[in-house]
Amino acid sequence: MKNSKAILQVPGTMKIISAEIPVPKEDEVLIKVEYVGICGSDVHGFESGPFIPPKDPNQEIGLGHECAGTVVAVGSRVRKFKPGDRVNIEPGVPCGHCRYCLEGKYNICPDVDFMATQPNYRGALTHYLCHPESFTYKLPDNMDTMEGALVEPAAVGMHAAMLADVKPGKKIIILGAGCIGLMTLQACKCLGATEIAVVDVLEKRLAMAEQLGATVVINGAKEDTIARCQQFTEDMGADIVFETAGSAVTVKQAPYLVMRGGKIMIVGTVPGDSAINFLKINREVTIQTVFRYANRYPVTIEAISSGRFDVKSMVTHIYDYRDVQQAFEESVNNKRDIIKGVIKISD
């Protein structure tokens, strides 16, 4: 077996270099990686470097954290897995003993070791990687490893929908129909919502939202978003508004779209300061931020396996590992056409 990994040489340039095959610790599994999804955070890292720059200027930077593959070796204390098992991973490994971890909120652990970011900047764009057994999940027989890799962004949408307490009968507005917006749409449908409006400015994304079950799609570049959403909610406002675009524009719109006593869920990463009209939310409106996920992989895997959550239809571009530079360049320059890109590492 030979190994290599793709690293960020400088912003805008990926390079594939040789690497040692890691040896699993007693509680780890060694995984042959097959697919890695390209996340928006990876694209940002490719363009500008990590959100949080490493303290060491010579730190090697890996990208990629949405991955799945096949177990090829296990540590001495591993009991749940054996070579040949197809698996995916939660890319964040928390400390396990802080207040947040003990409360089950390990996604906000201050010492979490999350792939492709601090402290180790270890990416998933490699042939082989080791991961703790406790954050590794076996895939059902009817799920392939491409779907397995996309459990990670799907879990973000599922976490957002479950935090928001989505239920049948609630009207939902989703601002943004990128990958996370579409994952949130499907999570809401899995939880019983049937009246869901999705807003975006790109027709291809809106067509995908309609294909995946949106009740109403609104092109914010051509229509008055607030007026159309008021029409959708019969001037009542939505029970829940999900901001998934990470845009100051959509954050500003959200208070005008939510009902009295409703919820605004900030799922996207919004840069800098954002103006919010607090007079519009001075009606017992809850604003909740969403950060990654905690304890959502099992329910997300089940939803995909059952056919209720379709991640594969969202994949518009598949790249070979050797074309990793092209994959990231197109992810930067072809955002209008790419809904979800994945990189095939190995068969």
Curated annotation (Swiss-Prot):
Pfam families assigned to the protein according to its UniProt record, in alphabetical order: ADH_N (PF08240), ADH_zinc_N (PF00107)
Keywords, sorted A to Z: Metal-binding, Oxidoreductase, Zinc
Listed EC numbers: 1.-.-.-
Binding-site residues for Zn(2+) 2, renumbered to this chain: 95, 98, 101, 109
Residues that, per the record, bind Zn(2+) 1: 39, 65, 152
Matching SMART domains: PKS_ER
GO MF annotations in UniProt: oxidoreductase activity, acting on the CH-OH group of donors, NAD or NADP as acceptor; zinc ion binding
Annotated InterPro entries: ADH-like_C (IPR013149), ADH-like_N (IPR013154), ADH_Zn_CS (IPR002328), GroES-like_sf (IPR011032), NAD(P)-bd_dom_sf (IPR036291), PKS_ER (IPR020843), SDH-like (IPR045306)
Catalytic class of the enzyme: oxidoreductase
Co-factor(s): Zn(2+)
UniProt remark on cofactor binding: Binds 2 Zn(2+) ions per subunit.
Family statement: Belongs to the zinc-containing alcohol dehydrogenase family.
Protein name: Uncharacterized zinc-type alcohol dehydrogenase-like protein YdjJ
Originating organism: Escherichia coli (strain K12)
